Amino acid sequence: MTLDDSSLQKFGFIKRETLGSINIDPLQTGGLLTGAAKQALVEWGDGYSVCDFCGGVLDLVKKPPIHDFVHKALPEFLGCDEARVTNGARESKFAVMHSMGKPGDWVVLDGLAHYSSYVAAERAGLNIEVVPHAGSPEYHLDPGRYGKAIEEVTKENGKPPVLALVTYPDGSYGNIPDAAKIASVCHEYDVPLLLNGAYSVGRMPVSAKEIGADFIVGSGHKSMAASGPVGVLGVSEEYAPVVFRKSVHNKVKEIELLGCTARGATVMTLMASFPEVVKRTRNWDQEVENARWFSSRLEGMGFIQRGQKPHSHDLMFFEAPGFYEISQKVKNGRYFLYRELKERNIHGIKSGLTKYFKLSTFGLGKEKLGTVADAFEDILKKYENI
């Protein structure tokens, strides 16, 4: 590529095509910036902006009040003893796995774990034992199967896994497993538990201590109304010295965090949205009620919701036989649904999906959810005679 003025134009300001749409994308509904975060994005957007008064450790910066956010607010919010800001939930998971295990050790993952949990384990050199789910239609995760998985690893390798992980909820079906029971089972074998709360921390009330988890991770850009990439990590007092150990070469730098993590706009938007994020978790019962109402509307049209029922999260997976049938009959049928929703200013179902898709109802409220449900119904009626 020749870097002349003409070719460089494509990399200037780019207008976002979907901005202003009703957004039902599970990746995005919990990450929409608050008004305060949008202001912070402009105010603190310059590179290392938060380092105007830095003594060498990001989480100890007092101006802006990152220290109080990380060491006072986050532990209370996450229900943990020590907390840090990271560059994302996956980076949080890797920090725990890399510090807790050595290459060749084993980790136990649930059968609905996110791909990044697998990749984090691989990067840390860990082997993986999977706790299977029960399959369709609910994909239930039996806490007792964690015990069996731990026993299997111990039998084959002579020692238990260094860590177990549960996804709370999973990113496919939005199932919320019995994490407290899973923690209890793991602790019977002296195996610590990591709670992957990428879709819960910032959306719903969740406390590592109440659940019994030794580690908790969250995603700022997925569920805490922050500009990404940014995440959070909470650790119990027992394991904090392991995960947050310091370098022998630079004595203030924590090894697993590579010294400092989210600098500038990411941490500042996370902080700016935090007051509103705390408040919105108190409205979780209403979010669940809205999700169930929406699911009921769709099932009345012939859609089939997979996963836990009654559902307890905004992320839901649907089978859509009506849409799929239409896609088999119309021109360029794979993309008809995307086109129809785009015309109605609705974004979030991936282009090409008609038979199965997931969506999120988080933060939309009954009025917008009604608009989406009405749109689905209108589309079905539009093609009912083809």
From Swiss-Prot:
Subunit structure as annotated in this protein's UniProt entry: Homodimer. Interacts with SepRS.
Cofactor: pyridoxal 5'-phosphate
EC number: 2.5.1.73
Function: Converts O-phospho-L-seryl-tRNA(Cys) (Sep-tRNA(Cys)) to L-cysteinyl-tRNA(Cys) (Cys-tRNA(Cys)).
Domain of life according to the entry: Archaea
UniProt: pyridoxal 5'-phosphate binding residues: 89-90, 196, 219-221
Gene Ontology BP terms: translation
Residue ranges of coiled coil: none
Reaction(s) catalysed by this chain's protein: O-phospho-L-seryl-tRNA(Cys) + hydrogen sulfide + H(+) = L-cysteinyl-tRNA(Cys) + phosphate
Modified residues (N6-(pyridoxal phosphate)lysine): 222
GO molecular function: Sep-tRNA:Cys-tRNA synthase activity
Protein name: O-phospho-L-seryl-tRNA:Cys-tRNA synthase
Pfam family for this entry, one: SepSecS
Stated family: Belongs to the SepCysS family.
Keywords, alphabetical: Protein biosynthesis, Pyridoxal phosphate, Transferase
InterPro entries given in the database record: PyrdxlP-dep_Trfase, PyrdxlP-dep_Trfase_major, PyrdxlP-dep_Trfase_small, Sep_Cys-tRNA_synth_arc, SepSecS/SepCysS
Species this chain originates from: Methanosarcina mazei (strain ATCC BAA-159 / DSM 3647 / Goe1 / Go1 / JCM 11833 / OCM 88) (Methanosarcina frisia)
